[in-house]
UniProtKB/Swiss-Prot annotation:
Topological category with respect to the lipid bilayer: Lipid-anchor
Residues binding GTP: 10-17, 57-61, 115-118
Lipid-anchored residues (S-geranylgeranyl cysteine): 188
Subcellular location: Cell junction, Adherens junction; Cell membrane
Family as reported in the entry's similarity comment: Belongs to the small GTPase superfamily. Rho family. CDC42 subfamily.
Entries under InterPro entries matching the protein: Cdc42, P-loop_NTPase, Small_GTP-bd, Small_GTPase, Small_GTPase_Rho
Name of the protein: Cdc42 homolog
Keyword Membrane belongs to the record: yes
Catalysed reaction, written as an equation: GTP + H2O = GDP + phosphate + H(+)
Length: 191
């Protein structure tokens, strides 16, 4: 059975672990526990063939900047996550996350993933953002950044409601199996 390695990166508290737990167990975790490094595996059927989707959760906190890249070798696709209600996590996609993964894995495809879309219309969240003269990140802003950074595409979801959740992983699988440059093997390698 072929394995697809998918590594999830992004700032702390943007919902990476919830995304993975909600997808793999259909349950939403009730409390926040910062991740050091976790992995999950699910079997998916693609064109009648079984694949193992290996999902690697990483810690977004700066304390783990040197440890995190140890999970990158042999990655088939990255999910670069930000919260649509955290403009700073959106900025860090460009400032930190994409530079980090492209430094280690230049040719590995990645998706830009907007998380926590259920909070985009929540009154208390909008009030907190407004106090800092901020607004939620829009679908258009996500698509624009994805294009600018050469992501395979922009997708968004809610781990809480599961809206768009399956699509994130379907698109990740497609990106891993159908890389845009079919002549080159695009797994991440450390030299």
């Amino acid at each position: 059975m072929q394995t697809i390695k998918c590594v999830v990166v992004g700032d702390g508290a943007v919902g990476k672990t919830c995304l993975l737990i909600s997808y793999t167990t259909n349950k939403f975790p009730s409390e926040y526990v910062p991740t050091v490094f976790d992995n999950y595996a699910v079997t998916v059927m693609i064109g009648g063939e079984p694949y193992t989707l290996g999902l690697f959760d990483t810690a977004g906190q700066e304390d783990y900047d040197r440890l995190r890249p140890l999970s990158y070798p042999q990655t088939d696709v990255f999910l670069v996550c930000f919260s649509v209600v955290s403009p700073s996590s959106f900025e860090n996609v460009k400032e930190k996350w994409v530079p980090e993964i492209t430094h280690h894995c230049q040719k590995t495809p990645f998706l830009l993933v907007g998380t926590q879309i259920d909070l985009r219309d929540e009154t208390s969240t909008l009030e907190k953002l407004a106090k800092n003269k901020q607004k939620p990140i829009t679908m258009e802003q996500g698509e624009k950044l994805a294009k600018e950074l050469k992501a395979v595409k922009y997708v968004e979801c809610s781990a809480l409601t599961q809206k768009g959740l399956k699509n994130v992983f379907d698109e990740a699988i497609l990106a891993a199996l159908e890389p845009p440059e079919p002549t080159k093997k695009r797994k991440c390698k450390f030299l």
